[in-house]
Amino acid sequence: MKYSLEKKEDYAIFNLQEENLNSLIAPKLKSEFIFLRNEGVEHLILDMNGVKYVDSSGLSAILTANR
């Protein structure tokens, strides 16, 4: 999974650099979101500018970030 992460004082910007957010990528994305949450990141901006397709597992990963 390709992404960039920019941490600011009050938030982080997670830029997903993949065309598809599907069952191959979703578990890795969930893990990253959980890791960031455990590190104390409370506000996350998810930049999906390059993503062209999201399946149900991708949507589930996004919802993980909202918890």
Task: Set out the residue ranges of the language-model regions.
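Short beta-strand/loop segment at the start of cytosolic alpha/beta domains
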Residues: 1-14
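Flexible glycine-/small-residue-rich
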Residues: 16-18
